[in-house]
Amino acid sequence: MRSNLFKEFDSISEKYWKQQIQFDLAGKDFNSEVNWTSYEGVNVKPFFTDKYKSANNFFIPENWNISQEIYLTEESKSNKEIKKLITQEVYDITIHIHKKNINLDILFNDIDLTFINIYFKLEDLNDLILSKLNEYAKKNKSQFHLDHDLLGDYLSSGNWKSNYKEEVIRFKNILKTITHFKSVIQLKSSNFQEAGANILQQISYSMCQANEYINLFGSTIIKQVNFEIAVGSNYFFEIAKIQAFRILWKTISNSYGIPINNVHIIAIPTNRNKTIYDYNNNLIRST
């Protein structure tokens, strides 16, 4: 279907496109007016033809879900929020938890957790809560994920809660507790986007950070890493960025002898190009 989509239209040569653009420019220089170079050093033309098409060896995700965040206040209230989101076909839900203890039976009452992903963002990695979540996941075959980025938190704040060595040891112990979680690290590549890194820097820094997690916690962590990516305004470049993440993480995982079928990516709109003054502008910039 893709190859025959435009078969009813006559093909137009690259030469014709260039002639038409030069005519429309009314004497202005073609190269300086419509060609430009991105921050990544990519020379972008005003049009591309099949001549520039590369091999179609893309990694397509198995599926995708709409995501939403909620903040846990009262378990019964949050239960209603989750049920409402599910009716709206939101199947990835991040729950921010600031409490020291939670009643999971009330929070997830009458909710089938086998087909939705629940991400837990804890203010503090409370051992009691994590242990309860792990047992609940084991009992109910839940798709639980830990939204935590040990190195990313340090990157964004500049401080360890205690010190580097103690934080690493503590997280190693936590990994022994949450053995029934589907993922345990949500690497915030978004930190680099929000700090002004270009796409190549975002990808390379994120892969270095992911590899450092492998060095710290062993190669088995590979299948338990998610990537949170902040999406900018350059539509095609952002598509290429996400595709590059998939290719590189699969390449790295293969080099460690742990092949993965799907790279788990959480895509969010970047805050870097947003304004506090105009909601409609922000909506357009995220489209």
Residue ranges and their predicted role:
Residues S206, T220, E228-T287:
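Active-site capping/gating regions of soluble enzymes
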Residues M1-Y235, Y256, N262-H264:
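Catalytic alpha/beta active-site cores
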